[in-house]
């Protein structure tokens, strides 16, 4: 009888682990909030500064977001072109690709309540000068220098997050 009870308990634990290990898009929490995942990336201008990296990770955790996956790497020009393909016709595209492939980046999968919106708020406006005026404690205000060397990337929607996570981690 004890063996059956133990087997039943173990089966239940393994079933919960299998379910929780599976990736998910967004789950509803109390009050209608969404537990979701988003893609975040620290750009080469930040990855050359270990203190800035540590500060940004601390800010992520203080914002109630969890780093689910993290990978430091150097993106190839081809990977940058694919990632930023939606901007391929824009005049800044060649410079963006050159910058993003110039040094290490840190790819992050973040999870938490309304993660896409919260990460975007944490990084602030795209242009670092604008961020310093409008969101002085944002990551881009603190660590960015301009519109391109702006410290961090953040998915702009749950759909973009799903696409970017698949592209950068799968």
Report each predicted region and the residues it spans.
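N-terminal chloroplast transit peptides
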Residues: 1-21
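Non-catalytic terminal and connector segments of soluble metabolic enzymes
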Residues: 18-19, 23-170
């Amino acid at each position: 009888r004890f063996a059956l009870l133990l087997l039943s308990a173990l089966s239940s634990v393994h079933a919960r682990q299998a379910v929780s290990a599976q990736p998910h898009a967004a789950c509803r929490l109390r009050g209608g909030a969404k537990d979701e995942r988003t893609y975040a990336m620290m750009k080469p201008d930040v990855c050359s500064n270990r203190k800035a990296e540590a500060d940004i990770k601390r800010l992520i955790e203080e914002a109630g977001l969890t780093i689910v996956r993290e990978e430091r790497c150097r993106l190839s020009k081809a990977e940058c072109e694919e990632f930023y393909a939606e901007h391929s016709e824009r005049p800044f595209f060649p410079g963006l690709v050159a910058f993003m492939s110039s040094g290490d980046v840190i790819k992050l999968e973040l999870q938490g309540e309304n993660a896409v919106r919260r990460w975007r708020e944490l990084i602030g406006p795209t242009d670092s000068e604008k961020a310093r005026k409008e969101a002085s404690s944002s990551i881009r205000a603190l660590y960015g220098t301009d519109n391109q060397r702006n410290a961090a990337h953040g998915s702009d929607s749950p759909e973009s997050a799903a696409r970017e996570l698949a592209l950068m981690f799968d």
